[in-house]
Amino acid sequence: MLYKGDTLYLDWLEDGIAELVFDAPGSVNKLDTATVASLGEAIGVLEQQSDLKGLLLRSNKAAFIVGADITEFLSLFLVPEEQLSQWLHFANSVFNRLEDLPVPTIAAVNGYALGGGCECVLATDYRLATPDLRIGLPETKLGIMPGFGGSVRMPRMLGADSALEIIAAGKDVGADQALKIGLVDGVVKAEKLVEGAIAILRQAINGDLDWKAKRQPKLEPLKLSKIEAAMSFTIAKGMVAQTAGKHYPAPITAVKTIEAAARFGREEALNLENKSFVPLAHTNEARALVGIFLNDQYVKGKAKKLTKDVETPKQAAVLGAGIMGGGIAYQSAWKGVPVVMKDINDKSLTLGMTEAAKLLNKQLERGKIDGLKLAGVISTIHPTLDYAGFDRVDVVVEAVVENPKVKKAVLAETEQKVRPDTVLASNTSTIPISELANALERPENFCGMHFFNPVHRMPLVEIIRGEKSSDETIAKVVAWASKMGKTPIVVNDCPGFFVNRVLFPYFAGFSQLLRDGAGFRKIDKVMEKQFGWPMGPAYLLDVVGIDTAHHAQAVMAAGFPQRMQKDYRDAIDALFDANRFGQKNGLGFWRYKEDSKGKPKKEEDVVVDDLLAKVSQPKRDFSEEEIIARMMIPMVNEVVRCLEEGIIATPAEADMALVYGLGFPPFHGGAFRWLDTLGSAKYLDMAQQYQHLGPLYEVPEGLRNKARHNEPYYPPVEPARPVGDLKTA
């Protein structure tokens, strides 16, 4: 053994060939600060071996290196800029020394090689991969950019266009694509990986492969003519501006850095990467996006822990076909859980099956599946007008009309047709689960399972625990949701549960703004362009459906009359009475026409102005700051109340539900992350300016206490140790 660290070791293989093996104590390898330091020590040992002829890098895990240790990021991002820059210089010196070894090097890459893992293998001369490879640089999705030389080496290896596509979008690619663009040199079966890598090394050692020529371009300026450079970088900047926008500075910074570094060799190019990385790491956007990643890991870990003792349902059923039922059936079947889909109407069944088939055909068109796979999946969805097969299902989700009487009748009837241990769930969006449970003989086997539309795209499923829902029931439904590829978050029961309960105060803020003379077009523009929502409130209401919102608004008002009961006729009422139901009938706040792809495209419709004038004061202008404050305060206050009342368990789960269920702007990180960034005292000052608008603007006492003591909702993070300590971590 030449070297043994906590996460890697170095040993001789044969005849002057050494192997450096990543083998962390956990289930995966991460390139954390300790591993970077250990890698530097191992390379120091290699530099002393006069008989070294070649080096093989490999992993003892199912994945090579999944990336940097993101749990370290928030503390690293608090380190002063100069210290962070010094540590990056140290880390890059490690990879430079790996790249500069006077012998050929190869990485045998299996599974994931992401972020720092990808940057590590870019420093070797050759890369041999297995078919399960996923390799790339996802840093821009975390609000930063590659910091271990990825933005320098990848463009010089692949060319500017391919590298920009991966780096700016934070993409990873599979084995075939990686081979095609030159990111790896070959793909072999897993059992042949080490053998194949040694064979390539031998060819390089023997002079059959010119490893020095392979290495040289990574040390030099990017080979690109002025015209080629102008085209590549102009197109890339245009694409990034269009897709990322101003709220996500990392992608455009990465592109500009690669452009600026193109005319320099490795050392100066790495200095430019360093100078760009450090300011990005200190942005609120980076902290928020890293926070989302960590919250996602927390939520998924909680679901995994909750379901460790239950069996995932093997057969499911959906009550109520149509678009929603068909979407749920598709998602379950697509992920391997067969479904019985029942409806009382043949047309609805046809609609549900058509929806499932349409979604499968999209997969076929994209080349994700072949005709055989399509036929296989669709054959596991069984449409029926009766209860045939319900005696074999493990879980049933009801997705009929949003009417408590209808839902109770359907659920009570279904309970008599299934096994005593079968779990029933309702896809209601607003009706309290405990109320629906009153119709059942076995309420302990019942809970809520709130999907979001469109089911195949929206990652969140709210799992609602009723007063009598058993732990086993919740666990089984969480297991099914996880199997479907969704992110389940368990909430306690109340009208609207969590997501809709906090959404409707936001809509109420919108209605009050309109009533006071604000224009919905400006509100939409401000909330989209300035705050960063994917849709403004008017557009979102049109997508949800004005009729759906009108009904849900009444349910929420009955559930929370003190805050959500209104004593005036609002814009939603006016549009509902005029039969303007939104996208579903082409008329809402906006008018909708289908584009060439059959998708609804919004257009101006001056008719709506006359309707709104009847429920609004004369038009007046509102500042962007006032619009954002009046829209967000009711939502944030309600989010805080839900935490204080135990409807949602943690700030992390609340923020993920908002991001995954409503599209809360990820660069803000969710309501609690936004609050912490703004500061609770500053938020309180802002909210008090609008408390005259009514109870929705009254800040909950718990938040007032936070403001008094200057306490955040997320645990405070301590800065990482000084750079000198980090080197020897």
Swiss-Prot record:
Region described as Disordered: spans on this chain: 708-729
Active site: 450 (for 3-hydroxyacyl-coa dehydrogenase activity)
Protein name as it appears in the record: Fatty acid oxidation complex subunit alpha
Alphabetical UniProt keywords: Fatty acid metabolism, Isomerase, Lipid degradation, Lipid metabolism, Lyase, Multifunctional enzyme, NAD, Oxidoreductase
Site location (Important for catalytic activity): 119, 139
HAMAP family referenced in this protein's UniProt entry, alphabetically: FadB
InterPro entries, alphabetized: 3-OHacyl-CoA_DH_CS (IPR006180), 3-OHacyl-CoA_DH_NAD-bd (IPR006176), 3HC_DH_C (IPR006108), 6-PGluconate_DH-like_C_sf (IPR008927), ClpP/crotonase-like_dom_sf (IPR029045), Enoyl-CoA_hyd/isom_CS (IPR018376), Enoyl-CoA_hydra/iso (IPR001753), FA_oxidation_alpha_subunit (IPR050136)
Pfam families membership: 3HCDH, 3HCDH_N, ECH_1
Region (Enoyl-CoA hydratase/isomerase): 1-189
Family: In the N-terminal section; belongs to the enoyl-CoA hydratase/isomerase family. In the C-terminal section; belongs to the 3-hydroxyacyl-CoA dehydrogenase family.
